């Protein structure tokens, strides 16, 4: 049986040594994952309430679709990331658990149901993401904008963060989202440039950097955010270079987390990073000038999103003196 990542060769790392990957059974075995990667089984009143709300309004969350390990903690803290534009993606990234295929027709009522859910859940910080919809002329940007505006009308005091696709670099699409005035604009770089052919074969590293730069150019007041995974075979100098690239393109908030292979059909994992290594990257990121760095084994884009935004705002105000 061949896997979808096996036809995606990448260049060797800068040190020239071939990358060795962990066998899937070792990753998932009883003694495979280190203790710091153990997450609680999702349960609790907050978790059940959010699940019922999402089901009742026919909404999707990336928490479920991408099999996020933090779903129990976040949902019990009344934090969820809404996934708009359906749950079928037009791309086939090597790390992602979201279904790939032909997407459904657009649901034009979805933005209003998301706003209704935000109101019912009493959220102070809503995160909106989506699958890629490359078949749409604007990549779904207009639906992002409609969702932001619907939340503003229903819950005026709620901060809105968007985690967008790259819209194939379409500046008009990026402007459509920024014109709706999100508080935070997030687009993930995901990995180091050398690994793009395997990890993000339909994306371009430079294009993602330009999306972030252009969003900040359009609205200097918006917080920009990006993140990447480690454990895919990158080396230290590539991690540091990627962090510098993001900072040089105006990114305010950085997230770094451990890649965890969703299934045997996804990209293999090279190694586990320790909590001490993540702490070192956080320190380095703050020294580079990021307003906030969330770096840890179980960190994902929206993990502690409200706290990230508040901390970054304080940092930006402090920098202005």
UniProtKB/Swiss-Prot annotation:
Alphabetically ordered keywords of this record: 4Fe-4S, Cytoplasm, Iron, Iron-sulfur, Metal-binding, S-adenosyl-L-methionine, Transferase
Binding-site list for [4Fe-4S] cluster 1: 63, 68, 74, 302
SUPFAM superfamilies tied to this protein: Radical SAM enzymes (SSF102114)
Biased composition range(s): Basic and acidic residues: 304-314
PROSITE patterns reported for this sequence: RADICAL_SAM
Group of enzyme by EC: transferase
Pathway(s) where this gene product acts: Protein modification; protein lipoylation via endogenous pathway; protein N(6)-(lipoyl)lysine from octanoyl-[acyl-carrier-protein]: step 2/2
Originating species: Rubrobacter xylanophilus (strain DSM 9941 / JCM 11954 / NBRC 16129 / PRD-1)
Protein name as annotated: Lipoyl synthase
Region described as Disordered: spans on this chain: 1-21, 301-321
UniProt similarity note: Belongs to the radical SAM superfamily. Lipoyl synthase family.
């Amino acid at each position: 049986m061949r896997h979808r990542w096996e036809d995606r060769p990448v260049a060797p790392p800068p040190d020239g040594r071939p990358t060795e990957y962990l066998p899937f059974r070792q990753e998932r075995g009883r003694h495979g994952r280190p203790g710091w990667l153990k997450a609680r089984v999702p349960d609790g009143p907050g978790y059940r309430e959010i699940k019922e709300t999402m089901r009742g309004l026919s909404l999707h969350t990336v928490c479920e679709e991408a099999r996020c390990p933090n779903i129990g903690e976040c949902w019990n803290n009344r934090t969820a990331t809404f996934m708009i534009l359906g749950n079928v993606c037009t791309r086939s990234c090597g790390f992602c658990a979201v279904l790939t295929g032909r997407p459904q027709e657009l649901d034009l009522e979805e933005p209003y149901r998301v706003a209704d859910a935000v109101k019912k859940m009493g959220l102070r910080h809503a995160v909106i993401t989506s699958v890629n919809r490359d078949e749409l002329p604007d990549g779904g940007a207009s639906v992002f904008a409609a969702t932001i505006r619907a939340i503003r009308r229903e819950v005026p005091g709620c901060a809105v963060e968007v985690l967008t696709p790259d819209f194939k670099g379409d500046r008009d699409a990026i402007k459509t989202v920024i014109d709706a005035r999100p508080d935070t604009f997030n687009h993930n770089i995901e990995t180091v440039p050398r690994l793009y052919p395997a990890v993000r074969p339909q994306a371009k590293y430079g294009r993602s950097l330009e999306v972030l730069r252009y969003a900040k150019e359009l609205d200097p007041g918006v917080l920009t955010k990006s993140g990447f995974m480690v454990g895919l075979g990158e080396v230290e100098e590539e991690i540091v270079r990627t962090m510098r690239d993001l900072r040089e393109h105006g990114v305010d908030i950085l997230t770094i987390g451990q890649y965890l292979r969703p299934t045997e059909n996804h990209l293999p994992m090279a190694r586990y990073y320790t909590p001490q290594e993540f702490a070192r990257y956080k320190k380095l990121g703050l020294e580079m000038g990021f307003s906030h760095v969330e770096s840890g084994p179980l960190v994902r884009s929206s993990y502690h999103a409200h706290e990230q935004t508040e901390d970054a705002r304080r940092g930006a105000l402090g920098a202005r003196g």
